[in-house]
Amino acid sequence: MKNNLWFKLSGVALLGLVVLGLAVPRGQTETTVTSVTLAAVVQDQQCQGGDNVNVTLTATLNPPQQNVQFQWDFNNDGIFDTPLSPNPMVTHVYPDETNVTAVVKVVKGRRSATDSVTFSTLRCEN
């Protein structure tokens, strides 16, 4: 009987830890259950005739997540230039020899995270 009582008490203690682990502190509106790292990366740049560069940007999540959507702001003006999409990769045409900061936002449910990448575009020969 002692073993049964201990087992029941252990179950209650464990349940209490789970509830405490998920409780939202007063004044906060969001709980982070897992830590996720978002990274924006320039995957490729290619001159596209004249003074334009076709830039491929991608976002990665570590650890990988399902049911997320990505949105890109190509010039860091605070306005996202793409609709939400499950595809983390986009292409955009920039002028050559330009310093650029692009921002990616990842959304999962009501949670979101952002990251930016700053880079210089290639010099294209006319």
Regions found by a protein language model. Name each.
Residues 8, 16-126:
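Extracellular/lumenal mature domains of secreted and surface-exposed proteins
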Residues 2-13:
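Bacterial N-terminal signal peptides that target proteins for export
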